[in-house]
Amino acid sequence: MSKEIVLEDHAFLVSETNEKGIITFASDDFCEIAGYSVEELIGKPHNLVRHPDMPKAAFKNLWDTVKDGNIWTGYVKNATKNGDYYWVYATVYPTITSEGTKGYLPCRRKATSEEIQKAINLYKTLQ
């Protein structure tokens, strides 16, 4: 049975992906919480940490938002390498380099228990 991993108050999980969602950078906090080494994450799709409880509609909204060049925020339940899970409040920034290369910068912090409960209730309506 999986268990919830509760982030430390100071934890700040950062990653970068290319336009197709392939991880190009993973912070130490992200690696530690997700249970992967940086080498295991680089080059893999970011949905590697997607938890099956997350409704597809939430990620459709995320992708539609950032592909349009807008910032997305929301609560996400992610899966760890060993099958546990953790909740985050995520902000995903669309990025573009000076060379014109597009990508995304997801930044995540600890979600409070109240925020998590609201997200659970909302996501039940989207299943």
Residue ranges and their predicted role:
Residues 3-125:
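Sensory/regulatory domains in signal-transduction proteins
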